[in-house]
């Protein structure tokens, strides 16, 4: 570090707290989700049938509950995880869709974002787990004692690897899709042949539509795996 005559630092990079594109997209997605679910919540408070956007959201909420939460966590424990599962599902889906807009803000293509989501899943899993969860890791029932000593570190390593697998899976799938689309768009300006341009344009359009499906699919996979981790943490001891 260098100082001037008054002992003020001259080569220190100032702390930058400006709002980046990713932060703006996350804030916008959070606001949209708040407004959407506020409408649905108000209809439930007054025992009314959901209207407008609520009609679209209600089947999706039921889908997450009946097809993801209950089968993987169980009816006894799923309710305390529902709010997080719904948040993760709709948040990832929405920011994936925003990444397909002309704004081009690919939030889930940023590994820091997927790391934060995976870290939250990991922390909730560990903090809400039962004693049987750790028993199956460090002292597995039905396994000879010498093997338990060998398998315990492997099981512990598996626990630590899970959030990284969750992080990389979401990041890589979204990033790869955007790279392919941007590469095809770039080829439109490389070729002078109108036939080639038309072919690449059609392929780009097809992949862009396919990305709409991928946006929902990746949200589903992340939520499903999260529910599986929660289910393993609260599983009852059957031995």
Task: Annotate each predicted stretch with a short phrase.
Residues 1-239:
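Selective transmembrane helix interface/packing segments
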């Amino acid at each position: 570090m260098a100082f001037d005559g008054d002992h003020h630092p001259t080569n220190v990079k100032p702390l930058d707290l400006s709002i980046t594109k990713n932060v703006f997209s996350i804030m916008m997605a959070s606001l949209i989700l708040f407004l959407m679910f506020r409408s649905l919540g108000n209809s439930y408070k007054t025992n009314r049938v959901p209207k407008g956007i609520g009609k679209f959201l209600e089947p999706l909420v039921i889908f997450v509950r009946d097809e993801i939460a209950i089968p993987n966590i169980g009816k006894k424990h799923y309710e305390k995880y529902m709010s997080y599962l719904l948040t993760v599902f709709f948040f990832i889906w929405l920011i994936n869709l925003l990444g397909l807009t002309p704004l081009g803000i690919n939030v889930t293509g940023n590994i820091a974002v997927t790391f934060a989501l995976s870290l939250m899943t990991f922390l909730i899993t560990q903090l809400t787990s039962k004693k049987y969860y750790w028993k199956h890791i460090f002292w597995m029932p039905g396994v000879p004692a010498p093997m338990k000593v060998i398998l315990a570190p492997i099981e512990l390593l598996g626990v630590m690897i899970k959030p990284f697998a969750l992080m990389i899976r979401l990041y890589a799938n979204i990033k790869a899709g955007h790279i392919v689309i941007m590469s095809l768009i770039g080829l439109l300006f490389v070729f002078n042949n109108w036939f080639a341009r038309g072919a690449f344009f059609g392929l780009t359009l097809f992949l862009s539509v396919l990305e709409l499906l991928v946006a929902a699919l990746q949200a589903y996979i992340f939520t499903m795996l999260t529910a599986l981790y929660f289910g393993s943490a609260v599983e009852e001891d059957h031995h």
